[in-house]
């Protein structure tokens, strides 16, 4: 697999999702990543630390330049815990848990987050404003309600299926209620 192509596709998708979700500085962005799927394998079976590092470093650079916080979801072997910066955990009141990821428990994305973040910790649960799922890792449990599917400009990064979610405030009220236009639902 061509690493330059994977990096280009990752950058394209992330910038597109950020444009469509209109995330603001200080927002939380969750990443689910299967490096196995990116390489054309089955999720969890052919993990690649190099691919994890390439993708996480690319995304972290884009988000950091905009003041958006990255949370990297692990696999079910770590109960889908997430790696965030300690400052983010403290700012959002997130519960820190004790686990250190490995390639096959947490995954390549989490290992990369531990490498590239300044003071990484694992947290049990977040309510992100939006997120990107590379390889059908199921990020929905970590995106706050109400979730809105976002169609990225590309449907795959490498060989991995790509989806994205944003969130919007709940619409409450009844027949008489009026709702302001939000940044995601343009009409």
UniProtKB/Swiss-Prot annotation:
NCBIfam families in UniProt: TIGR01440 family protein (TIGR01440)
Domain of life: Bacteria
Protein name (Swiss-Prot/TrEMBL): UPF0340 protein SP70585_0722
InterPro entries reported in the protein's UniProt record: Antibiotic_NAT-like, DUF436
Pfam families according to UniProt: DUF436 (PF04260)
Stated family: Belongs to the UPF0340 family.
Residues annotated as transmembrane: none
